[in-house]
Amino acid sequence: MTPKVIINPAAGQGAAGKAWPGIAARLRAALGEIDISQTAQAGEETALARQALAAGHNHFIAVGGDGTMNGVLNGIMGEDGT
């Protein structure tokens, strides 16, 4: 399955969104196909990660700040902490 990339373009006062085109190009060059989801509101990373996990994704890349990484990890971990 293709890696799931979850990006928060608002992270770093918009720096993540500005850097995204270059990051995406480098990810595609290194990994080939990637499946991208962008957050539209704060805290959406967790739900996006849970949806991706349910769809069978098992490789995740978080693009943003520490809150983005935390949200993605919370989505992957599951409610029972596993």
Where are these regions (language model features)?
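ATP/NTP phosphate-donor binding region
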Residues: 1-60, 70
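Short Gly/Thr/Asp-enriched flexible loops that form oxyanion-binding sites at enzyme active sites
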Residues: 68-81
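Secondary-structure boundary/capping residues
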Residues: 36, 81-82
